[in-house]
């Protein structure tokens, strides 16, 4: 029986963004079930106008003899005309789009036209509460929604049940699924580092404790709070030990979307050894960085999932996180003696409410910090919580990890890896299986739209 063909709309899977990386992982993990065509997005794509058939290379990498993957590079995420062309040329069985729904308003404008022939699928993440009821029309435009975080699953279930408008239909069970990001355990894993790797970053300097931050230098990632938290931690150490700890940052030092980290360090971090990685790294190199670190930190005020800390735990390195968005899914939170599930979040909403949930039982591999919530907004996104932490509270958690032995930290990280591969469900295999199950359900249950739909007013 011929495989179904999926048209994927997302970042070019050859690129380095988080969306591109996840796209690549689930495409490679499901090429035995589906043929893939990607409208491969990038800003001012250098390959615009070309078509790339990656099938032979994918066959070598995966061992799937009939793997079929084709890319159409494009400037941005697309438009109505190119979708119509690809529907005619490639004749896919479904369209799957991935990232913030605000990028896809043009797609939702033609959803009725598309859904006369193929289902429209959405791999979805939403950063925070309150429930974004302004997304209701977007959800109505999709036949199936795969939710990347448990919080997103709860949000989507609740918003989808809002029936204010007569044309809105309540989602059927198959239409909303939990499809967590999965980390490739064959790439991110505990290893013995090559002798020269540490020297390539630190020279001959040896550190007793390395805190690692791997994020874009943008405002919501809170890089300055990380710097100030580390400085506060260092000031609490005896003077003779201050030179033996460092903050390793894998990011741009100056970014218009973030800040000038060099000036911040010069003015406010006189006691800190802050070192920036010297280059971009392959996935293997990123795994080296996680293994080099003692702890990885992410205290972003909005975070859909947080790939860096998830990769860190899979590599066996423990973490510090802000209890926000998808970062919660990496903690192994428990209530009433069981791990929280996606269905639990329909009622809970989010654990970011400090008054209700601070101190919730969690895995040994993480030290979570509960935020204070404020509400931000814009015209397209009228309201969303902004979950901020106090950098002084973060410094306390850094000290807690520091006071443990390296062996204790490593043991905690390895427990996290085992949990992710098991009950945590954050393995690559689970992402691909849940993605396939969702797609199969959509293909099986899809009912093409009629050309016209009659509404009685």
Where are the model-predicted features located?
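C-terminal amphipathic helix plus adjacent low-complexity
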Residues: 352-457
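Short hydrophobic beta-strand element within catalytic cores of glycosyltransferases
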Residues: 318-321, 338-341
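Extended catalytic core of nucleotide-activated donor transferases of GT-like folds
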Residues: 8, 53-151
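Aromatic "clamp/platform" in nucleotide-sugar-dependent glycosyltransferases that forms part
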Residues: 301
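Conserved donor-binding/catalytic core segment of Leloir-type glycosyltransferases
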Residues: 8, 203-221, 227-230, 247
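A short, active-site helix/loop in glycosyltransferases that binds the activated sugar's phosphate group
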Residues: 132-176, 183-190
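N-terminal subdomain of nucleotide-sugar transferases
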Residues: 1-56, 90, 456
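Nucleotide-activated donor-binding/catalytic signature segment of Leloir-type glycosyltransferases, i.e.
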Residues: 70, 258-280, 284
């Amino acid at each position: 029986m011929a495989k179904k063909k999926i048209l994927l709309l997302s970042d070019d899977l050859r690129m380095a963004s988080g969306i591109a990386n996840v796209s690549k992982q689930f495409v490679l993990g499901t090429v035995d079930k589906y043929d893939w065509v990607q409208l491969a997005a990038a800003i001012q794509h250098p390959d615009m106008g070309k078509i790339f058939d990656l099938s032979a290379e994918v066959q070598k990498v995966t061992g799937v003899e009939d793997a079929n993957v084709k890319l159409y590079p494009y400037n941005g995420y697309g438009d109505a005309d190119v979708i119509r062309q690809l529907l005619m040329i490639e004749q896919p069985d479904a369209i799957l789009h991935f990232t913030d729904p605000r990028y896809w308003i043009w797609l939702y404008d033609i959803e009725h036209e598309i859904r006369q022939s193929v289902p429209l699928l959405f791999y979805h993440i939403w950063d925070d509460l309150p429930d974004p009821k302004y997304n209701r029309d977007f959800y109505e435009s999709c036949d199936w929604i795969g939710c990347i975080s448990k919080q997103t699953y709860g949000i989507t279930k609740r918003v989808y049940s809002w029936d204010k408008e007569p044309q809105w239909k309540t989602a059927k069970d198959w239409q909303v699924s939990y499809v967590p990001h999965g980390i490739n355990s064959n790439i991110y894993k505990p290893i013995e580092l090559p002798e020269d790797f540490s020297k390539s970053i630190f020279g001959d300097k040896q550190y007793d404790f390395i805190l690692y931050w791997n994020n874009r230098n943008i405002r919501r990632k809170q890089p300055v709070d990380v710097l100030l938290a580390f400085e506060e931690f260092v000031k609490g150490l005896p003077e003779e030990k201050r030179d033996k700890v460092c903050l390793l940052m894998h990011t741009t030092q100056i970014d218009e979307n973030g800040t000038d980290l060099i000036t911040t360090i010069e003015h406010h971090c006189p006691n800190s050894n802050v070192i920036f990685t010297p280059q971009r790294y392959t996935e293997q190199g990123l795994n080296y960085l996680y293994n080099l670190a003692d702890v990885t930190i992410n205290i972003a005020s909005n975070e859909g999932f947080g790939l860096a800390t998830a990769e860190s735990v899979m590599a066996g390195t423990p973490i510090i996180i802000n209890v926000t968005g998808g970062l919660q899914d990496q903690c192994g939170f428990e209530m009433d003696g069981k791990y929280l599930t996606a269905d639990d979040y329909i009622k809970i909403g989010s654990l970011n409410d400090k008054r209700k949930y601070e101190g919730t039982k969690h895995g040994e591999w993480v030290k979570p910090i509960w935020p204070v919530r404020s509400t931000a907004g814009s015209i397209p996104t009228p309201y969303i919580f902004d979950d901020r932490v106090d950098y002084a509270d973060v410094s306390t958690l850094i000290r807690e990890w520091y006071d443990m032995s390296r062996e204790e930290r490593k043991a905690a990280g390895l427990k996290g890896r085992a949990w992710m591969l098991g009950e945590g469900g954050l393995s690559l295999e689970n992402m691909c299986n849940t993605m396939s199950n969702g797609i199969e359900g959509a293909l099986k249950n899809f009912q093409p739209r009629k050309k016209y739909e009659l509404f009685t007013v």
